[in-house]
């Protein structure tokens, strides 16, 4: 957790395994605090937007990218954007294409907010990134549950085959979770068990945000 007692904006980092429930928690907190803060004062940024640009590579090399390894992320740009937002400056967030396996020519314009929710699997693995965060959260969902959710999602939403999802899980998703993501749980201020429907944990996170904002 950041040591700043009066942050210019509050940055919440929600990490955990792929399909652990990070996006559900982020969207739930966002939706429920919109009514209190005004939707223009709270926003979500996905770590996925900061995968490195691979336009200089051919498709054969792009598809070999290990998206579960910290080296796949453009950490420098993400940290630069967080610093800019904290100083009151807007940023243009890259738009990443999973079809082309690289950034598109489009960007998402993002204005400074009172509360920014970051969500992504690798957020707590980088010390410099953790230093920019007000509250760090780890969603601690059993890995077998995450795999089932990921399998269903990737086959339904991304048109992938059962074999390709299982192969990716075996080769990169599970090993990278054990090597990088699970150890990063030690840096979390809040650990949320049972995934995105843990109502008590969500209420605790909202209460912490209110406290940092000076609201009761």
From Swiss-Prot:
Keyword Cytoplasm among record annotations: yes
Localization in the cell: Cytoplasm
GO BP of this protein: CTP salvage; UMP salvage
PANTHER family the record matches: URIDINE KINASE (PTHR10285)
InterPro entries on file: P-loop_NTPase, PRK/URK, Uridine_kinase, Uridine_kinase-like
Keyword Kinase: yes
Pathway in which this enzyme or protein is active: Pyrimidine metabolism; CTP biosynthesis via salvage pathway; CTP from cytidine: step 1/3; Pyrimidine metabolism; UMP biosynthesis via salvage pathway; UMP from uridine: step 1/1
Keywords (A to Z) from UniProt: ATP-binding, Cytoplasm, Kinase, Nucleotide-binding, Transferase
Native organism: Pasteurella multocida (strain Pm70)
Catalytic activity: uridine + ATP = UMP + ADP + H(+); cytidine + ATP = CMP + ADP + H(+)
Class in the EC hierarchy, top level: transferase
Gene3D superfamilies: P-loop containing nucleotide triphosphate hydrolases
Annotated ATP binding sites: 16-23
Family to which the UniProt record says this protein belongs: Belongs to the uridine kinase family.
Record-listed E.C. numbers: 2.7.1.48
GO annotation, cellular component aspect: cytoplasm
UniProt name for this protein: Uridine kinase
Primary localization: cytoplasm
Gene Ontology MF, one: cytidine kinase activity
